[in-house]
Amino acid sequence: MRVILSAIGKLKKSAPEYVLMQTYLKRLKWSFDMKEYEEKKALSGEDLKNAEADLLLSGVPEKAKVVVLDEHGETLSSREFAGKLRTWQNQGADTVAFLIGGADGHGNRAKKKADLMLSFGRMTLPHFLMRVVLAEQIYRAQTILDGHPYHRD
């Protein structure tokens, strides 16, 4: 499986979040691509969210499954998340793209494209920290699917 993380904001390689994220990505057997885009500071409101949605979606293949991270999305356990990825694999999906929007959230264009709106809880997390949490959960899902003992119920 190929995993794409498409995010607004550029994370410096010297940032602790980047270093921690890399610890999980280096363990990942699946291919991983990160696409980062500059914030559109000149825009606001729906114009901003839709411009950012266009950027986030620009690097996503047409047939990819799209997961939009949003505080109002569906919450899944780690096993349920792994099961969702397995279902998509069994349906022939070879790419899953995760979208992390800007500070104002996602525009309707991104939400309409979503195969899953995913929430990691009702709290708002910093976008750079969310990348770490997502990387760990993708790695955890892979280990669950492989029967590796990393995940414990």
Regions from the PLM with identified roles:
Residues 108-152:
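Structured adenosyl-cofactor binding patch, chiefly the S-adenosyl-L-methionine
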Residues 11, 71-74, 102-105:
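Short glycine-rich anion-binding loops that position phosphate/pyrophosphate groups of nucleotides
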Residues 1-28:
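N-terminal beta1-alpha1 ligand-phosphate binding loop
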